[in-house]
């Protein structure tokens, strides 16, 4: 346990941020998984809708600093390429 008051506060803040980031990343993985399942099943309309919502979640996570903006861009690009192959 730390002795410095400001470090104790940083520890609490970091723990809250870690839990928030964990939740956001989990929902991102779920969204990407749902998109890939729709593509695998050949449901192009459903996959297109899921691509829009997944892209939005990726952008939001990047703007909040949960993931890097380039990582979000790369994931969106890869998902769009997957959809266009259908």
From Swiss-Prot:
Disulfide bonds: none
Keyword Ribosomal protein among UniProt keywords: yes
Record GO terms (molecular function): small ribosomal subunit rRNA binding; structural constituent of ribosome
Keywords noted in UniProt: Ribonucleoprotein, Ribosomal protein, RNA-binding, rRNA-binding
InterPro entries the UniProt entry points to: Ribosomal_bS20, Ribosomal_bS20_sf
A GO biological-process term: translation
Disordered as annotated region, ranges: 1-25
GO cellular component: a single term: small ribosomal subunit
Pfam families reported for this sequence: Ribosomal_S20p
Coiled coil residues, start to end: none
Role description: Binds directly to 16S ribosomal RNA.
Protein name from the UniProt record: Small ribosomal subunit protein bS20
């Amino acid at each position: 346990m730390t002795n410095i008051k400001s470090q104790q506060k940083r520890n609490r803040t970091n723990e809250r941020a870690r839990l928030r980031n964990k939740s956001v990343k989990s929902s991102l993985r779920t969204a990407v998984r749902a998109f890939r399942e729709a593509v695998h099943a050949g449901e192009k309309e459903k996959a297109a809708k899921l691509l829009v919502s997944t892209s939005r979640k990726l952008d939001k996570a990047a703007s909040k600093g949960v993931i890097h903006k380039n990582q979000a861009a790369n994931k969106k690009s890869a998902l769009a390429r997957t959809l266009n192959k259908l």
